[in-house]
């Protein structure tokens, strides 16, 4: 069995880890970083950039640079949270034909899983470069409070990226695995507070150790899938925009370029204020009007930032109370508090969490890497590389069906350990009813339409009978990924209908297959582009070295030979301006052939001088390889 990699697909940053022997290793990407910005950009010349290269060009290409896509994955366009984002994001969020939230980039409609797949492809490539083998399987993490549609959309993203998603695992649970695996923790109850770039989760987890086997059992989970660092950034951006408007009378919200610069500066200032008491946000030439250029220079203190975001931090405390209540525990029974997610580096967050639990959070868990490490551990469990670890996760929200009077009747309660299966018998609401509609719901509200609709199907062919007589057995079966399978069976006739819930929204099989094909086509285009760049680099070096030799020993050549070399140089120079790799390679070969006379002229006699030239030639070869690698990294 091949390696199963662990991927933390984050809102702001993503990370990939593997089991390497007995150790878990977080891998560096082609830019040398252990985390990759979850940013995708589509350039004017048709190139797709992912990670740091995409982030670097965001200011000049705001409408085609996509970030925080995880906040849209598996969501409906009309969702309140999506509408909120649609008003502030520089890129265009649209309604798909099925009502999902999609994006429009350069007049092309794209689904969030399709875009997230680009990040997953980079994670896959990072692992392949390190291991030197093809990777096809992964464990991918999601916020614990993700619903069924969001989980399914994440699996779709994996498929589009060319990965078989062996397991979807909750982020706080993954962090608990990272924390508990290499420590002699004994039996402990821990709280994992996970405040990332776009989502917030709290999980109460019990770690038991019996005869060397560790069991990680999630007792309760809660959260908010639309609360994270992006919201903190927005508060800072709004403050800076308002201050600038007061000073200059100019509203930067109408200038996408200025807003992109401001977003970058706000995020940087927020990070700086975790270690400094104040910082300057200084953006010269932020905009201009008839009176000339305008400069933004605003001093922000840590106290000011805290006053802007305190309400957001307080919003995270309510789910803590609910999770403890659901677990049947008091604060004093929590032995360790683990902080996960970059936003937990903020001193105010750490203080509020410490005050709530009455103890300082642990500092020995890397908030950026713990989730990917846990995912890799789960991958190791599935592949058999990791023994003596058992993970018992839960479903975050209740699952049920709509019954008479528009009521939600739960079949599986929230915080039920998964995988699980539950059946319940229902009947008809009217006499001689020949069909029933099974409307599957997820949520905690009593009124059916206040919950998330996951889908519906009909069971027909029910034998005529008075209301209340037919026996319709509805079975809910949740797999280890937290994805739901529902069946309804008429016990009298034996007729049965089954569906795997993919939500009333989501991508259908045909759309996923098309996106997989598109991704494969892009991979081929990327490979051809890399080969073209390699040929250009070789051509450039050959031009440079040949011209240098021509200057040094050209006067020793016959006029015809010199003319032939000059012509070949011009032909190669012309080919390098084009896009035809075969043409470039042909001109390289032509120049190599005619420049043989140069080599003879520069090596009139064998010996030390010739050896030195050989060494120089070898160095030139090394340079070609190194530069090709560098260009490839930038892709």
UniProtKB/Swiss-Prot annotation:
Q: Which domain of life is it from?
A: Bacteria
Q: Where are the transmembrane segments?
A: none
Q: What does the record say about induction?
A: By stress conditions e.g. heat shock.
Fetch the Pfam families from UniProt: HSP70 (PF00012)
Per the record, residues carrying Phosphothreonine are 199
Recorded hits in CDD domains, A to Z, give: ASKHA_NBD_HSP70_DnaK-like
Kindly give the SUPFAM superfamilies that the UniProt entry links to this protein.
Answer: Actin-like ATPase domain, Heat shock protein 70kD (HSP70), C-terminal subdomain, Heat shock protein 70kD (HSP70), peptide-binding domain
**Residue numbers spanned by region Disordered:** 600-635
Keywords from the named record: ATP-binding, Chaperone, Nucleotide-binding, Phosphoprotein, Stress response
Single GO MF annotation: unfolded protein binding
UniProt keyword Nucleotide-binding present: yes
Q: Is Ribonucleoprotein set as a keyword in this record?
A: no
The family assignment reads: Belongs to the heat shock protein 70 family.
Purpose: Acts as a chaperone.
Q: Give the protein's recorded name.
A: Chaperone protein DnaK
Gene coding for it: dnaK
């Amino acid at each position: 069995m091949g390696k199963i990699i662990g991927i933390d697909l984050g809102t702001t940053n993503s990370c990939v880890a593997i089991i390497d022997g007995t150790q878990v290793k977080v891998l560096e990407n082609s830019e040398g970083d252990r985390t990759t910005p979850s940013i995708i950009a589509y350039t004017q010349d048709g190139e797709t950039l992912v990670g740091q290269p995409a982030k670097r060009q965001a200011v000049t290409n705001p409408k085609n640079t996509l970030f925080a896509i995880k906040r849209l994955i598996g969501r409906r366009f009309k969702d309140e949270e999506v509408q909120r984002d649609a008003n502030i994001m520089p890129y265009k969020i649209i309604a798909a034909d099925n009502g999902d939230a999609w994006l429009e980039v350069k007049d092309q409609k794209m689904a969030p899983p399709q875009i997230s797949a680009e990040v997953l492809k980079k994670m896959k490539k990072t692992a392949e470069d390190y291991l030197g083998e093809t990777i096809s399987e992964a464990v991918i993490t999601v916020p614990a409070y993700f619903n069924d549609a969001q989980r399914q959309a994440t699996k779709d993203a994996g498929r589009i990226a060319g990965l078989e998603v062996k397991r979807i695992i909750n982020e706080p649970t993954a962090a608990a695995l990272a924390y508990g695996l290499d420590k002699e923790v004994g039996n402990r109850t821990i709280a994992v507070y996970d405040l990332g770039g776009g989502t917030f989760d709290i999980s109460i987890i019990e770690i038991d150790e019996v005869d060397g086997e560790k069991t990680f059992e999630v007792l309760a989970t809660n959260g908010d899938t639309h609360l994270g660092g992006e919201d903190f950034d927005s508060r800072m951006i709004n403050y800076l925009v308002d201050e600038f408007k007061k000073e200059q009378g100019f509203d930067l919200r109408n200038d996408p370029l200025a807003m992109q610069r401001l977003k970058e500066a706000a995020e940087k200032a927020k990070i700086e204020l975790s270690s400094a008491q104040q910082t300057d946000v200084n953006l010269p030439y932020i905009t201009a009007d008839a009176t000339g250029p305008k400069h933004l220079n605003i001093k922000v203190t840590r106290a000011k930032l805290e006053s802007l975001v305190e309400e957001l931090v307080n919003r995270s405390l309510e789910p803590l109370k609910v999770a403890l209540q659901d677990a049947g525990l008091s604060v004093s029974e929590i032995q360790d508090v683990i902080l996960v997610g970059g936003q937990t580096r903020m001193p105010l967050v750490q203080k509020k969490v410490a005050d709530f639990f009455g103890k300082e959070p642990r500092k020995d868990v890397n908030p950026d890497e713990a989730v990917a490490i846990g995912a890799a551990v789960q991958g190791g469990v599935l592949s058999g590389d990791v023994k003596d670890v058992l993970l018992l996760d839960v479903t975050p929200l209740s699952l049920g069906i709509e019954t008479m009077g528009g009521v939600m009747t739960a079949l599986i309660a929230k915080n039920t350990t998964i995988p699980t299966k539950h059946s319940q018998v229902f009947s008809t609401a009217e006499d001689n009813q020949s069909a029933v509609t099974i409307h599957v719901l997820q949520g905690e509200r009593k009124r059916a339409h206040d919950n998330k609709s996951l889908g519906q199907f009909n069971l027909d062919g029910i034998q005529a009978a008075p209301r209340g007589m037919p026996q319709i057995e509805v079975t809910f079966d949740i797999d280890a990924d937290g994805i739901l399978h529902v069946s309804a069976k008429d016990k009298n006739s034996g007729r049965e209908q089954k569906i795997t819930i993919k939500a009333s929204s989501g991508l259908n099989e045909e759309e996923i297959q098309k996106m997989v094909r598109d991704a494969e086509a892009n991979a081929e285009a990327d490979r051809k582009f890399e080969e073209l760049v390699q040929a250009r680099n070789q051509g450039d070096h050959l031009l440079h070295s040949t011209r240098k030799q021509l200057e040094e020993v050209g006067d020793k050549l016959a006029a015809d030979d010199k003319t032939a070399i000059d012509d070949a140089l011009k032909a190669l120079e012309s080919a390098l301006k084009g896009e035809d790799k075969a043409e470039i390679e042909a001109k390289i070969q032509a120049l190599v052939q005619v420049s043989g006379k140069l080599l003879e002229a520069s090596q009139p006699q064998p010996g030390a001088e010739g050896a030195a030239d050989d060494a120089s030639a070898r160095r030139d070869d090394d340079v070609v390889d190194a530069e090709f690698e560098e260009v490839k990294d930038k892709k």
